[in-house]
Amino acid sequence: MSVSYEDVVNAYALIQNHIINTESYYSNVLSEILGSKIIVKYENKQHTGSFKVRGALNKLLSLSKAEKQNGIIAMSAGNHSQGVAYSAKILGIKSTIVMPDNTPFDKIRKTSDLGADVIIHGETLNDAEKHVDSLVKKNNFTKIHPFNDKFIIAGQGTMALEFIEDHPDIDTLLVPVGGGGLIAGCSLIAKHLNKKIEVIGVETELFPSLYNVYNNTNFICGGSTLAEGIAVSNIGKIPLSIIKKNVKEVLKVSENSIEEAVSIFLLKDKVVSEGAGAAGLAAILENKDKFKNRNVGIFLCGGNIDSRVLSSILMRDLVRKGQIITLSIAMADKPGQLGAISKLCAEERVNILGVEHSRFALDLSVSSARLEITLETRNNEHAKNIIKKIELLGFSVIVKNTK
């Protein structure tokens, strides 16, 4: 079951009145950091915060009257659930979404708020899909697959249709890869509009399913990833047939790079990205020479990230930059020791965030104490300077939170 350029154009005609033609523009700040001309499609500003509504709408609009009346069902741990629920709501179709146990609560709540009946079932997406299949048989629902469906693929491809028509100078397109629906649709459009565009897939190193196909490797898929939206172990058969014709290569990126990319989007470009949405930027971070002086198009394809996770990313970024450090300081157990360090911190304009003073750890001598202190500094250089000055006071210092 193939997908054509005309399928994507027809999909756009169907859904364009229901979606946002999200903004895309050259990012000066990202380009200066990375040495490439970076053009970003900000699909995090789409309805439900991701591109998934495009494919979902196109699929639901293709259903027969009877299928719509019987209701639809989908499995998802991420944005597909919200895309389907939103589309069903505006089209007046009853929806049921099955989500695995590890789905972030924020996504469960948002899906429920959109009117879907949410069922939590199984540890993995495969477990959820098995339950979906049983409910399809029981209730005669229509299953809305997240990527292995020609209507879904055509809908996702409309994002590239907008992007490349707005920026015909793009010569490289980086696309996050989960099950393959997005990159199948986008690569199809890219190659139709400009055969010279290089389309490159990007996966987290924990789920390199398409990378394995392209490189004849057998890396195991699994693990806890920040990019749960692309944590898929197997590429769909329908998208894979399209991908092989249009995608040049696939890159896998580390979790650290994805985390850094999310942080850069927020702190430098002033936008919120989820892990999967930052995969393209992460690929450039790891391959600056490869993309130097190219006109690189990237999709910030989703901005649905748990606030606690985002907070943790920002705090960890401060640790990497040396702006927050935790020191373990050995000292004699006598009056004035803590005061000396507090005085030094005040003189050096260092903020004390937390203090723990221990006398009873068995690895200490009876006349010793240990101070664990968390400090806020200006940068790595400032942090190194305060450590040196503490040591000059006669204390032994160990830095606890390092890169």
Task: Show the residue positions of the predicted features.
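PLP-dependent amino-acid enzyme catalytic core
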Residues: 1-403
